[in-house]
Curated annotation (Swiss-Prot):
HAMAP family: UPF0349. Pfam families: DUF1450. InterPro entries: DUF1450, UPF0349. It comes from Bacillus mycoides (strain KBAB4) (Bacillus weihenstephanensis). Belongs to the UPF0349 family. This is UPF0349 protein BcerKBAB4_4757. It comes from the Bacteria. NCBIfam families: PRK13669.1.
Length: 79
């Protein structure tokens, strides 16, 4: 089974999304990756974000980001 891919920018982790990465890593149904730069510097500067299957998902807080990641996956199933 292919798992949803959640990607984080290391620069954004330093800005606060580290806690979201740690929460999402605990979910065995997700592949969570960390990269040096994802090329979304403007979005990265604004606040917590991640790429979910290649699409930008943002949150005003870490909790909101985690919730938005799950909401996005519910609204956009892979199959």
């Amino acid at each position: 089974m292919i798992k949803p891919l959640i990607e984080f920018c290391v620069g954004n982790l330093a800005s606060g999304s580290q806690a979201a990465l740690e929460k999402l890593e605990k979910d065995p149904n997700l592949d969570v990756m960390e990269y040096g730069c994802l090329g979304y510097c403007g979005i990265c500067f604004e606040g917590p974000f991640a790429l979910v299957n290649g699409e930008v998902v943002q949150g005003a807080t870490v909790e909101e980001l985690v919730n938005n990641v799950y909401d996005y996956m519910d609204e956009n199933p892979m199959f």
